[in-house]
Amino acid sequence: MQTYNAGTFDVIVVGAGHAGVEAGLASGRMGAKTLMLTINLDMVAFMPCNPSVGGPAKGVVVREIDALGGEMGRNTDKTYIQMRMLNTGKGPAVRALRAQADKWDYQHEMKHTIEKEENITLRQGLVDRLVIEDGVCKGVITNSGAIYYAKTVVITTGTFSRGEIIVGELRYSSGPNNQQPSVKLSEHLEELGFELRRFKTGTPPRVKSSTIDYSKTEEQPGDDHPRAFSFDTVEMLLDQLPCWLTYTNETTHEIIQANLHRSPMFTATKKGTGARYCPSIEDKIVRFSDKPRHQIFLEPEGKNTEEVYVQGLSTSLPEEVQREMLRTIPGLENVEMMRVGYAIEYDAVMPDQLWPSLETKLVEGLFTAGQINGTSGYEEAAGQGLMAGINAARKVFAKEPVILGRDQAYIGVLIDDLVTKGTEEPYRLLTSRAEYRLLLRHDNADLRLTEIGHEIGLISDERYERFLAKQSAIEAEKERLQKTRIKPTAEVQAMLKEIGSGELKDGILAADLLRRPEITYDKIAQIVSRETFVTDEIAEQVEIQIKYEGYIQKSNLQVEKMKRMEDKKIPENIDYDAISGLATEALEKLKKIEPLSIAQASRISGVNPADISILLVYIEQGKIAKRDKEKA
């Protein structure tokens, strides 16, 4: 095919899903002339699976994206149909915000946001190859012969990469939701020497709302006073839609058991590795055969559609089996299935081939982000996309990449896990993966990351001023409570007795009283009058910082210890083969991962403490030899 020069840009983003839109917006807003290419303009920021954003760990990521200047939180706040705070009865480290999005409004709002950005060109096109010169990515070539040149390229092709849809015995080449797949780009990446692996994900059937008997299900309403994902959101949408809870039963399970031989999960048809933490209903029935039932949530896909997402029933069983098992579930006895559930297999680039900046080690100037890196979930994709877009733009401007630490953000945990440990299955972010999760809370994402967002140019001066005002208000209120003494008056003693707290023998500082588990900030406010208005957000932050001060200090000490290891950098071009005493597995892993610091090396699977000690001695001896040489 004849090719032609279609234009020159600073950054090209291939794909416009949740990773792609964040990458493109970050790059464009940082001043880089950005081209976004997508197979179908009608699918920008589309939600091919569940119509929700947030949840445990993921909701914190959305807050982090917002604090850094990304768009997912703002867009969700504009388009949600339900908002709920999860785990409110537990500690602050595991609380999480989750929204049901209107999936159609979400994608339309995001597309329009991109279209309004002056530095972004949004264009429909299918990328087949990259332009590579001397190991450096210089642009892309589309299937129509258009050559677009750029200084950096970000690939965010998601499950479109050589995608194949599977429903029972039916298997065909396709992207999600029966879209055109991207085949030749995967083949080209293999030609370049990238290691790809087949992964799998799935989605449940969609059913018609008017054919559901909701009287047989349990209503799951949104919060009466919904919280926002974005620091910028002032007014919340109060017109919410409920979700509904029902359950599978023994009849459902019998139908599934009788048809396991037709499920790609249990036949040679399935080649890809599925997500451990998002199993299909077939997988759940087999793995948890002792369970008499499984939860099913009925989630509306939007305000102006009859389609309902059957959360918990992800499946790739044949169409007629799906219809049969749906009708065994209470409330769904007469349900009409509008879309069949399916599994999709796709190519993933093994992420240990990336630097922590998400630039590939094999090709300079080429970045990858999202499900192509082996992750699952919109939020994980968006977080990676944001960081890849930031670093692609910073490379154009000859600036150092932004790399978030494991103590700074869940996004930092996610990327470090991927590039340091790799993944054998679709990676899902969990609170248990973060060793400093008390520091990485949903409520303090802005306090952790707004400074960085402002420094790199994604947070406006006006928003930064509002952030500083909030920060000052928190410190002022903490200081007030640390100085204010509460006397054991009859009124105070009566209140303490009423809530089951021990009476005061002497006066006590308000901050010390707040440290009692049963005492809330609201109770303190009833006793100690305030001269200035304190918002709910500031009150929450003051309470958490005072109540958990001891635990937070312990976590900070652990972080300082880790940072000392992070500061011990491994020299570039180190010859691991020259280090005697390293275990064979450690030698192989160190050569493959090429860790940047001793801390990162210590997190590599297969590298044990003895190997780290040998590596430290080798590096220190090298420094001594270098100093001796300089003195001579």
Curated annotation (Swiss-Prot):
PROSITE patterns per UniProt: GIDA_1, GIDA_2
Record keywords, A-Z: Cytoplasm, FAD, Flavoprotein, NAD, tRNA processing
Claim: Flavoprotein is one of the keywords in the record: yes
Cofactor section: FAD
SMART domains, A to Z: GIDA_assoc_3
GO molecular function terms listed in the Swiss-Prot or TrEMBL record: flavin adenine dinucleotide binding
Primary site of residence: cytoplasm
UniProt-listed Pfam families: GIDA, GIDA_C_1st, SAM_GIDA_C
Alphabetized NCBIfam families for the sequence: mnmG_gidA
Protein name: tRNA uridine 5-carboxymethylaminomethyl modification enzyme MnmG
Lineage of the species this protein comes from: Bacteria, Bacillati, Bacillota, Bacilli, Bacillales
Gene this chain is encoded by: mnmG
